Amino acid sequence: MGGIFRVYEEVSVNGQKGGSMSEKRQGEKNFTKKKSFPKSAAIAIFWGLGLLLAAVLILHHNPLADQVTERMKKVSGCVLSAFTCTIFTIYYDRIVTIPIELFQSRGLIWKLAKNDFKKRYAGSYLGIVWALAQPVVTVLMYWIVFDKVFQARVEFVAADGVAPPYVLYLMAGLVPWFYFSEAISQGTMALVEYSYLVKKVVFNISILPIIKVIAATFIHIFFVGILLVVAVCYGYTPTVYTVQILYYSICLVFFVLALSYLTSALVVFIRDLQQVISIALQIGMWATPIMWNIKMLPSDNMKTLFKLNPLVYIVNGYRSAIFEEEWFWEHFYSSTYFWIFTISMFCIGTLVFRRLRSHFADVL
């Protein structure tokens, strides 16, 4: 606790170390007025992008796909795009506040994220080794059980006639999943863990969830490196497609951050949400094609239903980047759906966060 507090004192956002709640709220209002982009121009640009996306959706045509499913995807995409643009227009002032705060506090965010990462393993003999141990043991356990004991790899991953080494297929799914699980768990509890900053200091509490997300990213970078090494060992040398790992990692960070603003705000008032998320993660691991191939599902409707899970896009993307050699724009509808969903969740999350933030200190 002291480490974070000292870092904040060194790089204070407002140059103050204390203040009443009324001063805090006034400071937040003044903070968001600085260097603000013209509202009408921002809304016009957002709607322009939304209309452009809708036009691309309507004009896109895949003659090999089921046309009924294609029309459903087009309609759903246009509706989601219109919904997101409408929410952005109505609640513009509330939605843009947090992105502005994050940008203006980027130096403080980086310092606090590094300090949070170091603090997590301070005092233990093995330190950061513990952060690596559980994921490695989990990968080895699943690999031994499914690949060596049951030898079920063909059924799980060779639905399209191509069977990469199962350990590589498994790691490409588990690496993004481990990051998502760790980041959403830590991000959800950010306000609760740093309650002393919420209550006692003039502090832009909107930076707390992203601090946790960035701290979890350090370990993720290490595991991405291990994943690439394993791929090379099996003969999958890096290609131009491998660069997409950066794109899919950015997708994952934005998606987790969008969810974290919503869950971190709600868990302050509903502590049971932490347990709900824990159970949801257990279910989500099996609902996401990490150990199995979504192509093995018997019907297109079931495949479409599972693809509503945004993590399917990311997990499949990691595999496309490493051994399937596919560009993300080849999955047009999946990419469009993912970003519309993520932006919508970010808008909703920031709205809820802004609506409840004045009550955080009282509850905590």
Q: Which role fits each region the language model picked out?
A:
Residues 5-11, 19-364:
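Hydrophobic transmembrane alpha-helices and immediately adjacent juxtamembrane helices
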